[in-house]
Amino acid sequence: MKILKILSINLIALMLTNSCVETKKSLEVEVVETSRSGNKLSKVEVFSEGKPTSKINLNPDKTFQTFTGFGGSFTESSAYLLNRLSKENRQKIIDAYFAESGARYSLTRTHMNSSDFSLGQYSYAPVEGDTLLANFSIEEDKDDIIPMIKEAMNASKEGFKIISSPWTAPPWMKDNNEWVGGKLKPEHYDTWALFFSKYVDAYKAEGIDIWGFTVENEPHGNGNNWESMHYTPEEMTDFVSNYLGPQLEKDGKGDKIIL
């Protein structure tokens, strides 16, 4: 039975409405705050106009770096909540982010294994000592995350890229045998690299392409009680150069981006 973590979230919703007066357009902004402490869609003080401090000149003919995309994250908790809505309302939300009539998200992120936005702690490799990952399974994602991604894919006309990030390796691969903190044991670097490759294959079997990875979420640690694992820059360089990169190349996944 999955246990939903109750997160204390202060949500500020900005509701923007346009009003037109003849040929001059103005923008009206209303700020509403909701929090667990008691505010229930409470209006807060409106913005006051300040004096301009900067002047921005836009020149579309002069370009520099290319943006890969804009977007947000697919998480187990958000997918779980989305699944509790009616089919009609769920589709409205998906369309608001991914459809042509919506924000048209083009770059997204999801988590490998559980994260602080999961309903509980889990790993795709739960069996201790399974260094060949014979028991690897993404079954946990099939209830929530994967259906949400597929609905987004159906709504998106141009498609979007997915970056996947682990918060932690399974505890049995770590020097502290815990979900929180600790480091990946050097003797499990090769197993952890194989984990990434198997993850790509498992999602591919579900019809979902993984575009790239970040090696670790918050590799310097976050000091909190949710899933984490730590790397020094030297350790991460070693892992990517000598284990993850070669494993992906060997398995025909050399086109995957490592960020």
Regions found by a protein language model. Give the residues of each.
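Secondary-structure transition/capping motifs at alpha-helix termini
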Residues: 1, 157-158, 204-209, 246-255
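Boundary/junction segments of secreted and surface-exposed precursor proteins
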Residues: 27-32
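Aromatic-lined carbohydrate-recognition surfaces of secreted/lumenal glycan-active proteins
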Residues: 163-166, 211-217, 233, 241-259
